């Protein structure tokens, strides 16, 4: 429906009233919700794009809803932390599938690789927001994993608010802080023959 009468700001992942990615105010979506999963998955990596076109469609400040949802392969060492009423059936199923496919020895590598890639995606998603003049901000789904009603293993912390060991707080603060230095460039990769 878009912004409603009486709202001081509009919290959304899309502003509406346009096609493709022109209305998006977060960089990734499920593939069923946006073409090829959104801007971050389907456009050439660059640091010169923002959400200006989307927020120009809205008469009040726009806040990005549930930005930075990037899956991290689970660390099965956390299963032993579940000692209360919650039981990690989901994690056991994932672990058993890995074992059935003779990949258990790679579990830690999968966790680390997806974790580090997730941090790069967090950074890119946040920088889209920070580059957008007049953007009202963003809210994350969560900093911790959500183990209920369908797993959302998208946090940099596990479900117990413990570090997953993939990023130090100082590093995270380097790209998610009140002041973040940004450079506007059409590419992420440059040749030594090109001028910046």
Question: Where are each of the predicted segments found?
Answer:
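Substrate-binding/catalytic cleft of secreted carbohydrate-active enzymes
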Residues: 1-157
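Aromatic-rich peripheral "rim/lid" segments of glycoside hydrolase catalytic domains that contact
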Residues: 140-196
């Amino acid at each position: 429906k878009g912004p409603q009468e009486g709202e001081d700001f509009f919290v959304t992942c899309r502003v509406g009233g346009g096609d493709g990615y022109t209305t998006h105010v977060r960089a990734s979506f499920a593939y069923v919700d946006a073409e090829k999963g959104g801007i971050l998955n389907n456009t050439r990596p660059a640091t010169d794009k923002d959400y200006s076109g989307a927020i120009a469609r809205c008469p009040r400040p726009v806040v990005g809803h549930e930005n930075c949802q990037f899956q991290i392969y689970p660390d099965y060492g956390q299963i032993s932390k579940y000692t209360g009423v919650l039981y990690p059936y989901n994690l056991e199923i994932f672990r058993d599938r890995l074992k059935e496919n003779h990949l258990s020895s790679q579990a830690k590598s999968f966790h680390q690789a997806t974790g580090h890639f997730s941090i790069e995606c967090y950074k890119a998603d946040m920088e889209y927001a920070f580059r957008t003049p007049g953007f009202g901000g963003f809210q994350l789904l969560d900093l911790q994993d959500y183990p209920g009603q369908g797993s959302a293993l998208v946090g940099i912390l596990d479900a117990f608010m413990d570090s997953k060991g993939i990023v130090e707080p100082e590093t995270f603060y380097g790209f998610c802080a009140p002041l973040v230095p940004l450079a506007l460039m059409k590419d992420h990769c440059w040749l030594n023959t090109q001028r910046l």
